[in-house]
A protein has these predicted regions:
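Enzymes that bind and transform nitrogen-containing heteroaromatic metabolites
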Residues: 1-173
Length: 173
């Protein structure tokens, strides 16, 4: 059975995945509980289904790979990485390597950032988009979508909301 490639990340209301300094401190809810969906998002449950995490070099340099110590992690970089169990440097052929893993039945989590995931979007390789919309307008930063994309039609599979955060889960038609 074929696996899936899943993009899962937070985005400001105006489309940024980090602020202009590369920070993520703005990723939190508004603290209100008036509106909440019956279902809840569980990142832990999501991760149980994931076999491989793919992230960019900046995410790696910020230590984000450390939260996935029980997963295989691929870093999108052409530079060598320190010898470490579970880390793999993936360069120019990242998309085709990830597609090979998907065809082996592995579920892949595209963690970020924008430059790393852009080729997957442009080649329409993402099976599932899970986007958490954070109730903040940053005004500037690094955008999720880098532009020059063609139309990709998706189907809304789930919508979860709590504390002002809306998590949208889209799948391919």
């Amino acid at each position: 059975m074929e696996g899936k490639i899943s993009l899962n990340l937070a985005m400001s209301l105006d489309g940024y995945i980090c602020d202009e300094n590369g920070g993520y401190q703005w990723i939190h809810g508004d603290g209100t509980h008036e509106l909440k969906s019956a279902s809840k998002w569980s990142h832990e449950e999501y991760l149980k289904e994931i076999d491989l995490v793919v992230m960019g070099r900046r995410c790696y340099e910020q230590g984000m790979h450390l939260e996935f110590n029980d997963k295989e992690v691929w870093i999108a970089t052409s530079k060598p990485l320190p010898a470490s169990e579970g880390l793999h440097a993936a360069g120019k052929e990242l998309c085709s390597q990830v597609l090979d893993e998907k065809q082996k039945g592995r579920n892949i989590y595209l963690y970020g950032g924008g430059v790393t995931i852009d080729p997957f979007i442009k080649q329409d390789l993402i099976d599932e988009y899970i986007i958490g919309i954070i109730p903040v307008i940053l005004g500037c930063g690094k955008p999720l979508f880098l532009g020059n994309n063609f139309t990709i039609e998706l189907r809304l599979k789930d919508c979860i909301y709590e504390e002002g955060i809306v998590i949208l889960r889209y799948v391919r038609h």
